Amino acid sequence: MRLWLLEKRKYREKTQDYIAYKARISRSMYAMIESGERNPSVPVAKKIAKVLNFDWTLFFEE
């Protein structure tokens, strides 16, 4: 579970649907990324990070 990602999304009061829409991925893909089931590609990591305003390399520090 990527709690840090969940916390960033909740802090900004955004839904998984909203983040997925803005990042141009499916909600199910975003849910799998947030839960830690899947790792995002670099382009997807950059899109999610842009929407939530954080450094995309956080995805790859785990």
Task: Give a label for each model feature.
Residues E37, S41-V44, E62:
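Extended rod-forming repeat segments used as scaffolds/tethers
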Residues R24, P43-L58:
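DNA major-groove recognition helix of helix-turn-helix/homeodomain DNA-binding modules
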Residues Y18, M29, L58:
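Residues in the helix-turn-helix
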